[in-house]
Structures are given as structure tokens and as C-alpha cells.
């Protein structure tokens, strides 16, 4: 009986402490609008080659693509580097992702081993891939599953 009481108390306390993701920035609060903006951005930039330090259609890196997308589509100013982007907003669980959230990956070592994209919908994200340029990828892909680091809501 005592064990049951302790177990019930522990379960109630655990339920009260559940982390709830914060609401998105007001400019990202309408998922339909965000998805449309991300689709338009992908259509405009699809296939743009990867270029470290780039922020134009002649070449763009992952954090540059995030900066340009958030600025041009949602009027949001983000830091330029992936490491800085990984510290803004609030960290959220992967199962709480909403369109417009940032997804981060550890694809190598050191500061240059980080990668960032923007969550779209249906477990997909848009990003500037080093091998294929700007594209849409699935978080279900084994590579991205293995290297997933964190998600952040801005």
C-alpha cells in the first residue's frame, strides 16, 4: 500500500513537471502562412549551390540560408553563424516541432561541424546541403536521425 502511494505521488509530480514548448514568435504563429512562405523560399532557392559564407543565389551556406529566409519571408533578424543561431530562442523536443522552428545537427567536429535547417512540415526541413545545395530533406533519413542535435523555437 505504501509503495502504491509513493508511486502515485511520483507520477503526479512527474505529470506536473512536463516541459511544454513555448508558442512560436508571432510572425511564425500561423502554420499555414509559414509553410507557404517556406515553400515559396524553397521554390526560389532550390538548387542554389552551397558556398561557405555565402548568402546569395550564387551560393549560400546553411546558416546564411536560414538568415535570408527568416529575414525575407518573416521579417525576423537572426545571427549569421550556426553556433549563434543554436543559442537563440528556446530548445524544444523533436516531437514538438512546428513549421519555422530551427533544427540543428552535429555533422562533424568543432564549430564547422554544425548544420542548421528550418522545419517545414511532415517531418521535413529545408536547408542548404553541402552536396546538393538548397533542398528539402526528411528528418526520417538515417543520416539526419543519427546527427540530430537539437531543435529551437524562435
From Swiss-Prot:
Top-level EC class, please? Answer: hydrolase
> Could you tell me the keywords of this UniProt record?
Cell membrane, Hydrolase, Lipoprotein, Membrane, Palmitate, Protease, Signal, Thiol protease
| Residues lipid-modified (S-diacylglycerol cysteine) | 16
Q: Where is the lipid attached (N-palmitoyl cysteine)?
A: 16
One GO molecular function term of this record is: cysteine-type peptidase activity
Signal peptide start and end residues:
1-15
Alphabetized Gene3D superfamilies for the sequence: endopeptidase domain like (from Nostoc punctiforme)
Q: Cite the SUPFAM superfamilies for this sequence.
A: Cysteine proteinases (SSF54001)
Family designation: Belongs to the peptidase C40 family.
The protein in question is named: Probable endopeptidase NlpC
Q: Organism, per UniProt? A: Escherichia coli (strain K12)
Q: What gene does the UniProt entry assign to this protein?
A: nlpC
Amino acid at each position: 500500500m505504501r509503495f502504491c502511494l509513493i508511486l502515485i505521488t511520483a507520477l503526479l509530480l512527474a505529470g506536473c513537471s512536463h516541459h511544454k514548448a513555448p508558442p512560436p514568435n508571432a510572425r511564425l504563429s500561423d502554420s499555414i502562412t509559414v509553410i507557404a512562405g517556406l515553400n515559396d523560399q524553397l521554390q526560389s532557392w532550390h538548387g542554389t549551390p552551397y558556398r561557405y559564407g555565402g548568402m546569395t543565389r550564387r551560393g549560400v551556406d546553411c546558416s546564411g540560408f536560414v538568415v535570408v529566409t527568416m529575414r525575407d519571408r518573416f521579417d525576423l533578424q537572426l545571427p549569421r553563424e550556426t553556433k549563434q543561431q543554436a543559442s537563440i530562442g528556446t530548445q524544444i523536443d523533436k516531437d514538438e516541432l512546428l513549421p519555422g522552428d530551427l533544427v540543428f545537427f552535429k555533422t562533424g567536429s568543432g564549430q564547422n561541424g554544425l548544420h542548421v535547417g528550418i522545419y517545414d512540415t511532415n517531418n521535413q526541413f529545408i536547408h542548404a546541403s553541402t552536396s546538393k545545395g538548397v533542398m528539402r530533406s526528411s528528418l526520417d533519413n538515417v543520416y539526419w536521425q543519427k546527427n540530430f542535435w537539437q531543435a529551437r523555437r524562435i
